[in-house]
Amino acid sequence: MAVPETRPNHTIYINNLNEKIKKDELKKSLYAIFSQFGQILDILVSRSLKMRGQAFVIFKEVSSATNALRSMQGFPFYDKPMRIQYAKTDSDIIAKMKGTFVERDRKREKRKPKSQETPAAKKAVQGGAAAPVVGTVQGPVPGMPPMTQAPRIMHHMPGQPPYMPPPGMIPPPGLAPGQLPPGAMPPQQLMPGQMPPAQPLSENPPNHILFLTNLPEETNELMLSMLFNQFPGFKEVRLVPGRHDIAFVEFDNEVQAGAARDALQGFKITQNNAMKISFAKK
């Protein structure tokens, strides 16, 4: 029986996530890879047993959610390919923005006869509808506490063509690695006003170790590993104690390191930090 297609939504639902990753680390990493597609209003991740390996990312614009879904479908995230779909209903934060939010009568829902409850309704009652309903995982993220601070806002990068994956990311279905969608501009031309992606920082000869600079303060080893481990020959990321803005990435050989450097040169981990990559000095 065919599953009805869910219409585009501000919120995307992600499952098949690595359940061993801590909640705070997972939210930071999801923000790091999805913020490039537009303003993120919230990311919902739950510790509950039923919702492990799942998350909701809420964008301000539907187009941002669409770009994220198409570009990142199947992306290897902590060694597992992400499965992404639209949420079936608006999240509360979006409903409030639209003026369609309706406070739920949870007591009435709980008194509903069990014989009339569907599995989806049961989950919605348990979770309080804090997050949108999606696919076979119906209802909200149960037990999610309110955010303790305002969500970080990442503005959409002007000029990014629809469904264009960031440099080096897995392309949409039907495109070979490195191939651009029809009509798309090369990565160096994606963002008008952006500083040119960096000529090589030095004339260092090819090396199997890359030197990264201009990294944002929130960069950590896991974030960089997720970017580079999609390339053949990746071995490890090494951070420099006391310096958040630089790092080293090691590959098996110079050719593999060069391919990763060319693909991720100028990649923006945040809107204001275009990563600069060169071969490390031997």
From Swiss-Prot:
Q: Which example biological process does GO assign this protein?
A: mRNA splicing, via spliceosome
Highest taxon of source? Eukaryota
A cellular-component GO term for this protein = U4/U6 x U5 tri-snRNP complex
Q: From the UniProt annotation, give the residues forming the signal peptide.
A: none
- Region Disordered: list its residue ranges: 101-141
The yes or no answer to whether the keyword RNA-binding is present is: yes
Give residue spans, biased composition: Low complexity: 119-141
**One MF term in the entry's GO annotations:** identical protein binding
Q: Which PROSITE patterns match?
A: RRM
Q: Which residues carry this modification: N6-acetyllysine?
A: K60
Q: Where does it localize? A: Nucleus
* Modified-residue entries (N-acetylalanine), positions: A2
* InterPro entries named in the record: Nucleotide-bd_a/b_plait_sf, RBD_domain_sf, RRM_dom, U1A_RRM1, U1A_RRM2
UniProt xrefs under SMART domains: RRM
Pfam families with a match to the protein in the record: RRM_1 (PF00076)
User: Which residues are annotated with the PTM Omega-N-methylarginine?
Assistant: R152
Q: Which UniProt keywords apply?
A: Acetylation, Methylation, mRNA processing, mRNA splicing, Nucleus, Repeat, Ribonucleoprotein, RNA-binding, Spliceosome
Domain RRM intervals:
10-89, 208-282
**Which PANTHER family does the UniProt entry name for this protein?**
U1 SMALL NUCLEAR RIBONUCLEOPROTEIN A/U2 SMALL NUCLEAR RIBONUCLEOPROTEIN B
Per UniProt, subunit arrangement is: U1 snRNP is composed of the 7 core Sm proteins SNRPB, SNRPD1, SNRPD2, SNRPD3, SNRPE, SNRPF and SNRPG that assemble in a heptameric protein ring on the Sm site of the small nuclear RNA to form the core snRNP, and at least three U1 snRNP-specific proteins SNRNP70/U1-70K, SNRPA/U1-A and SNRPC/U1-C. Interacts with SFPQ; component of a snRNP-free complex with SFPQ.
Functional note: Component of the spliceosomal U1 snRNP, which is essential for recognition of the pre-mRNA 5' splice-site and the subsequent assembly of the spliceosome. U1 snRNP is the first snRNP to interact with pre-mRNA. This interaction is required for the subsequent binding of U2 snRNP and the U4/U6/U5 tri-snRNP. SNRPA binds stem loop II of U1 snRNA. In a snRNP-free form (SF-A) may be involved in coupled pre-mRNA splicing and polyadenylation process. May bind preferentially to the 5'-UGCAC-3' motif on RNAs.
Q: To which protein family does this belong? A: Belongs to the RRM U1 A/B'' family.
Q: What is this protein called?
A: U1 small nuclear ribonucleoprotein A
